[in-house]
Every structure is written in C-alpha cells, then in structure tokens.
Amino acid sequence: MVATNDVISYDINVPYTEVEEDTRPNTKYTRYLPTWDKIRFDPLPPFQYHDPALRVRDKSLPNLLTRNAEVSDIQPMLGSIVKGVQLTDLSDRGKDELAYLISQRKVIVLPDQDLIDAGPAKQSEFMSHFGKPNYQPVSGTVPGHPGFHIIHRNGNKDEIAKFLEQKTTTSLWHQDVSYEIQPPGYVMLGLLQGPEVGGDTVFAAADVAYR
C-alpha cells in the first residue's frame, strides 16, 4: 500500500528543481531552460475579451491559406496540419483567420516554423494578438517572460521510476487552467527539442463529450 504523501500526482515532464549545469551542453535552446524568478502575480481582474476569430468575414481564409498552403486533417472532428505558412509572415487579418481555423479544428499543427528561433519576445508579441497572457504560478518559465510554461524532462529517472510504481502508463491527461474564471482561449505549444520517437502529446475534443 502506498502512503498518501508518497503519491506523485504532478506532471513528470515538468521539473520542480533548478536545472543542473550538466544539462546545458545537451540543450539546443538553453534560454528556455526553466527558471523560477521570484515574481508575485496580483489577481487578474475581469476583462472584456474579443475573440479574433469573430472578425473573420471571408471563410475561405485568403490571408492565411494562400496558394502555397497545404491543409490535411488528422481526424474528422479534431486536428489539422497546415504546411506552407510561416506565422512570422502573417498579417493581422491572417492571424484572425488562424484563430478562426483553430475554432473550427481545435488543434492546428504548423511544422517548420522560424518563430521557434525568433526568441521569447517575438513569440510573446505574436500570441498577444489572440488575447491576454496567462501566467502559470507554479512552473518554471523563461527569465523576463513569465507567460511561458516550460515542459522539460531533466533526466529525473528516479522520479519517473517512482511514478511508474503507482501507474500502468505514462499517459497523463489534464485540462489547462480550467479553474480560472476566464481561462485561456488560445495556447501555443512549440517543440524545441525532443526524441526521434515517443513523447507524443495527445489532444481530445472535450466539447464532443457534451453532445
């Protein structure tokens, strides 16, 4: 029988300790290694939110899906892959149309983005088009950019072994900050460095469960 205080219930991909120096030589994007700045967040007051998807009038999405764009669906109800589109080249109308496409397909995968190398400031600027930033108060982030939530496997093999003593799978499901009064409308997930296989992120359409 496992004692209650021994149960690991948090995400095993998110370290809760400082990154050790021997991690850095094997890390391609060292600026994104998690840090814990001593920052206090005041309660976020209610605010008016205007979804950029509602500004779209032409449902053919001409500013997003240009002649170079290729769209393929992953599942009938959820997920599409869009190739031939660079996020850094999108106009404001193109970003609105991206929001509309996300509202229809829930998850959009955009491979080979140069936004990955543009740095956290440019990435934050891009996401500001879609609404106010959300801050994760308990996870590591990028110095000077508290709106980033860093998912990092830091070689915590002992922790993972302990986790698997209590579980029959490494698959973990969660719903992002659904406890908030005004949860995020859009989330951008970028893969900086990962294994050749494994480490998959799975998405589910929770709205379908209510039909």
Give the predicted meaning of each segment.
Residues 2-211:
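Non-heme Fe(II) oxygenase catalytic core, chiefly the N-lobe of the double-stranded beta-helix
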